[in-house]
Amino acid sequence: MAPIKSRRIAVLGSRSVGKSSLTVQYVENHFVESYYPTIENTFSKNIKYKGQEFATEIIDTAGQDEYSILNSKHSIGIHGYVLVYSITSKSSFEMVKIVRDKILNHTGTEWVPIVVVGNKSDLHMQRAVTAEEGKALANEWKCAWTEASARHNENVARAFELIISEIEKQANPSPPGDGKGCVIA
């Protein structure tokens, strides 16, 4: 059996988009009804992906805005990023673009493993960001995308499996011309 691989994942996005709800639902299998702004929490969970065991450290961050400074602990030693927006908030969707730019500037790279997550998919009557907009952004960034509902535990595990997939894509690149591209779930 292959040795366990360690991976650090940062969950970033605007305030009140459900970063903590996604993380707690994934790690502890329950939805937190009340809202308490997060300063920062770190969770651990073992993930099995394609037969490989991953010991993950998931850093649930405070909400970002355009004036937030990306903390170096959110870039140094981080293997991948889960960028979360609320499907009910166009401004939170715009904020993931700013956060990604900050990550790329801070890391000095053109690409990092990212999954973009449109959270609160259960609030479809209040939708402000279409699935097509989310998919288009993921295609532009050559990254993974999914919508999720932390409340109903829909696609929550999928979001974290996708970030492991993106991380492994970087760690074990495919030969050129294999026709593989973005993953949209």
UniProtKB/Swiss-Prot annotation:
<feature type="binding site">
    <location>
        <position position="150"/>
    </location>
    <ligand>
        <name>GTP</name>
    </ligand>
</feature>
<dbReference type="GO" id="GO:0003924">
    <property type="term" value="F:GTPase activity"/>
</dbReference>
<feature type="propeptide" description="Removed in mature form">
    <location>
        <begin position="183"/>
        <end position="185"/>
    </location>
</feature>
<feature type="binding site">
    <location>
        <position position="16"/>
    </location>
    <ligand>
        <name>GTP</name>
    </ligand>
</feature>
<dbReference type="GO" id="GO:1905589">
    <property type="term" value="P:positive regulation of L-arginine import across plasma membrane"/>
</dbReference>
<feature type="binding site">
    <location>
        <position position="38"/>
    </location>
    <ligand>
        <name>GTP</name>
    </ligand>
</feature>
<feature type="lipid moiety-binding region" description="S-farnesyl cysteine">
    <location>
        <position position="182"/>
    </location>
</feature>
<feature type="binding site">
    <location>
        <position position="18"/>
    </location>
    <ligand>
        <name>GTP</name>
    </ligand>
</feature>
<comment type="similarity">
    <text>Belongs to the small GTPase superfamily. Rheb family.</text>
</comment>
<feature type="binding site">
    <location>
        <position position="32"/>
    </location>
    <ligand>
        <name>GTP</name>
    </ligand>
</feature>
<keyword id="KW-0449">Lipoprotein</keyword>
<feature type="modified residue" description="Cysteine methyl ester">
    <location>
        <position position="182"/>
    </location>
</feature>
<dbReference type="InterPro" id="IPR027417">
    <property type="entry name" value="P-loop_NTPase"/>
</dbReference>
<keyword id="KW-0472">Membrane</keyword>
<feature type="binding site">
    <location>
        <position position="122"/>
    </location>
    <ligand>
        <name>GTP</name>
    </ligand>
</feature>
<keyword id="KW-0488">Methylation</keyword>
<keyword id="KW-0547">Nucleotide-binding</keyword>
<dbReference type="InterPro" id="IPR001806">
    <property type="entry name" value="Small_GTPase"/>
</dbReference>
<keyword id="KW-0636">Prenylation</keyword>
<dbReference type="GO" id="GO:0005886">
    <property type="term" value="C:plasma membrane"/>
</dbReference>
<keyword id="KW-1003">Cell membrane</keyword>
<keyword id="KW-0460">Magnesium</keyword>
<dbReference type="GO" id="GO:0043539">
    <property type="term" value="F:protein serine/threonine kinase activator activity"/>
</dbReference>
<dbReference type="InterPro" id="IPR020849">
    <property type="entry name" value="Small_GTPase_Ras-type"/>
</dbReference>
<comment type="function">
    <text>Binds GTP and exhibits intrinsic GTPase activity. Regulates entry into stationary phase when extracellular nitrogen levels are adequate for growth.</text>
</comment>
<feature type="binding site">
    <location>
        <position position="38"/>
    </location>
    <ligand>
        <name>Mg(2+)</name>
    </ligand>
</feature>
<feature type="binding site">
    <location>
        <position position="21"/>
    </location>
    <ligand>
        <name>GTP</name>
    </ligand>
</feature>
<dbReference type="Pfam" id="PF00071">
    <property type="entry name" value="Ras"/>
</dbReference>
<keyword id="KW-0378">Hydrolase</keyword>
<dbReference type="GO" id="GO:0005525">
    <property type="term" value="F:GTP binding"/>
</dbReference>
<dbReference type="GO" id="GO:0005829">
    <property type="term" value="C:cytosol"/>
</dbReference>
<feature type="binding site">
    <location>
        <position position="19"/>
    </location>
    <ligand>
        <name>GTP</name>
    </ligand>
</feature>
<dbReference type="GO" id="GO:1904263">
    <property type="term" value="P:positive regulation of TORC1 signaling"/>
</dbReference>
<dbReference type="InterPro" id="IPR005225">
    <property type="entry name" value="Small_GTP-bd"/>
</dbReference>
<dbReference type="GO" id="GO:0005634">
    <property type="term" value="C:nucleus"/>
</dbReference>
<feature type="binding site">
    <location>
        <position position="35"/>
    </location>
    <ligand>
        <name>GTP</name>
    </ligand>
</feature>
<feature type="short sequence motif" description="Effector region">
    <location>
        <begin position="35"/>
        <end position="43"/>
    </location>
</feature>
<feature type="binding site">
    <location>
        <position position="20"/>
    </location>
    <ligand>
        <name>Mg(2+)</name>
    </ligand>
</feature>
<protein>
    <recommendedName>
        <fullName>GTP-binding protein rhb1</fullName>
        <ecNumber>3.6.5.-</ecNumber>
    </recommendedName>
</protein>
<dbReference type="GO" id="GO:0031234">
    <property type="term" value="C:extrinsic component of cytoplasmic side of plasma membrane"/>
</dbReference>
<dbReference type="GO" id="GO:0046872">
    <property type="term" value="F:metal ion binding"/>
</dbReference>
<keyword id="KW-0342">GTP-binding</keyword>
